[in-house]
Amino acid sequence: MKNNIILEGFMGSGKTTVGIRLSYKLFMTVVDTDKLIEKEQGMTVSEIFEKEGEEAFRKLETACLQKLLDEGNKQIISLGGGTPIREENRELLKKLGIVVYLRVKPQTVYDRIKNDTSRPLLQCENPLQRICDMMFARKEAYESTADIIIDTDELSFDEIINLIRDAVEQYEKDRGISL
């Protein structure tokens, strides 16, 4: 297993912001898989979805994870919200490092991203219902991949970061490993 901390969770769960702040606290590099894909493809995630479709984007996520597995170490990796839905991605994530699931309630997600037009999967008539449906469909994938689960709804970013740091330290201690 690589010495990375991987942040997974639904869109709007705080993965990107937590990843950046956690990287400062732990003196680790932060990598956002969506940003890597956008840079490599020369398009935003929304544009990839629109032009190529979701399945093409999911394949790009798999290729990105494989590249990180081949090259990356001692990083905070912030995933796209749908990355764990593919079985092959879940297998790669387990090899990449410690997976932390930032769990959040549907209403919290909706409140955070209701005005964000860059979320292609939420451009629909009833975004809150879509969030509920998608979270239900992804729940098992998130939970089966996670080594650590943090419920983030009522927490500040500093509280989340401290919980992650403490949980990762305990995880390492319990397994005799070290990042």
Give residue ranges: language-model regions.
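Walker A/P-loop
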Residues: 16
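ATP-binding Walker
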Residues: 13
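Hydrophobic anchor at the beta1->P-loop junction of P-loop NTPases
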Residues: 7
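A glycine- and Lys/Arg-enriched "phosphate-lid" helix/loop adjacent to the NTP-binding pocket
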Residues: 96-139
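NTP-dependent small-molecule kinase module
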Residues: 2, 21, 25, 98, ...
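Short glycine-rich anion-binding loops that position phosphate/pyrophosphate groups of nucleotides
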Residues: 81-83, 105-107, 155
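P-loop (Walker A) phosphate-binding loop of NTP-binding proteins
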Residues: 10
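ATP-dependent small-molecule kinase phosphotransfer cores
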Residues: 32-83, 87-94, 119
